[in-house]
Amino acid sequence: MLKVAKAYEGKGNIVMTTGFQKGGNYCPNTSFLATVDTNIVAKYMIAEVAEGMDLNSYNGPYVERTIAKAGVIKAGTSYRIITKLEQKALAVAAITQKETGCPISMHTDFGTMGSEILDEIEKNGGKSEKTVLCHMQRNPDRYYYSSILDRGATICFDEPNKAAYRPDTEIAENICWLLDRGYENQIVLGMDAGRVEGLASYRESVGRANGLEYLLTRFVPLLRKMSVSEEKIHKMLVENPSNVFSIEV
């Protein structure tokens, strides 16, 4: 993490993440998230935003702060359920957001539980307006999208090039539908390509694959073919991320 921050210093903006993945990644009986009081866990997250991220990701046996500060809080939920552990992580995220002004980025399983996520965040003092719900293309319900956007949240469509889930044309058509209804300020685009199979450079020894550039070289041109204006494309790629991922002071 620190190596990445130093390597790209002065070359671009990298937003580091604090927080938790969905609950299934943690032991419900012995993990840090499960055993430590919510407000104490939140203090550790707040420190990663305000002071610097721990070099060892809080794996112990001591905390060593770095110069790199977190700029986004992550939490995650399961398919059609928010487990007790995930509710706790959402409470931690909301408390951290309230104290730091840092945005929340949510993993959703197949785009489910979006409304319930916002309920949990708001209940604990967080803001839907500073919350991004990711992987939403996997649940292609346009009116469900509208109900979430009407609460001020941002939706991220982040899986073009993953036809096993949804085809690019369907994702693009749903984006167009939302744009036609005035939601252009609440949509961001991305590539959920954190694993090796999503990074072309890691697969050169195997064969040809698309990487992060697919968003700009294939998906954005598809939006243009569907008559999405350059202004709206710029909003989704530049302005909206800049706004929602800014830290409120």
Mark where each language-model region is.
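Helix-coil boundary/capping segments in enzymes
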Residues: 1-36, 128, 135-137, 168-169, ...
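Active-site gating/metal-coordination segments in enzymes
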Residues: 10-15, 20-103, 154, 160-164
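Histidine/acidic-residue-rich catalytic or RNA/ligand-binding cores of hydrolases
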Residues: 26, 113-121, 141-149, 165-175, ...
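Active-site beta-loop-alpha junctions enriched in small/polar residues
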Residues: 19-23, 78, 109-111, 136-139, ...
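Catalytic pocket-lining loop regions of alpha/beta-barrel enzymes
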Residues: 94, 98-180
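Divalent metal-coordination and catalytic microenvironments
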Residues: 97, 155, 192, 233, ...
